[in-house]
């Protein structure tokens, strides 16, 4: 298991109260493959440095995960297929 940090930028038209539950459905992939979710931190709506798909704002969420590389790749793939996800970035922490 490796430690990862995942940043997700979501469509700003989403209701901010539904962000954490909708992310939780994606994070079930990690739990099903034996990984753990250490922390989910929803930053809320922030201005983007540049427009993404004609959006000037996005809802940011940062998630700390312990999982295998294959599990994180599958999570990133599923997030990429969702239309409400504007951008994802996965970073591996070096300890």
Curated annotation (Swiss-Prot):
Gene3D superfamilies: 3.30.70.60. One of its GO terms (biological process) is translation. GO terms for molecular function: small ribosomal subunit rRNA binding; structural constituent of ribosome. The keyword RNA-binding applies. One of its GO terms (cellular component) is cytoplasm. It holds the Pfam family Ribosomal_S6. Keywords: Ribonucleoprotein, Ribosomal protein, RNA-binding, rRNA-binding. Coiled coil: none annotated. The keyword rRNA-binding applies. It comes from the Bacteria. Belongs to the bacterial ribosomal protein bS6 family. HAMAP family: Ribosomal_bS6. Binds together with bS18 to 16S ribosomal RNA. This is Small ribosomal subunit protein bS6. It comes from Rhodococcus erythropolis (strain PR4 / NBRC 100887).
């Amino acid at each position: 298991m490796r430690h990862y940090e995942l940043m997700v930028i979501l469509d700003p038209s989403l209701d901010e109260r539904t962000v954490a539950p909708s992310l939780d459905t994606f994070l079930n992939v990690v739990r099903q493959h034996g990984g753990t979710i250490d922390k989910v931190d929803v930053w809320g709506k922030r201005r983007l440095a540049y427009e993404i798909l004609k959006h000037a704002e996005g809802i940011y969420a940062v998630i700390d995960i312990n999982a295998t590389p294959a599990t994180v790749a599958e999570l990133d793939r599923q997030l990429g297929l969702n239309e409400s996800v504007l951008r994802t970035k996965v970073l591996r922490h070096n300890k």
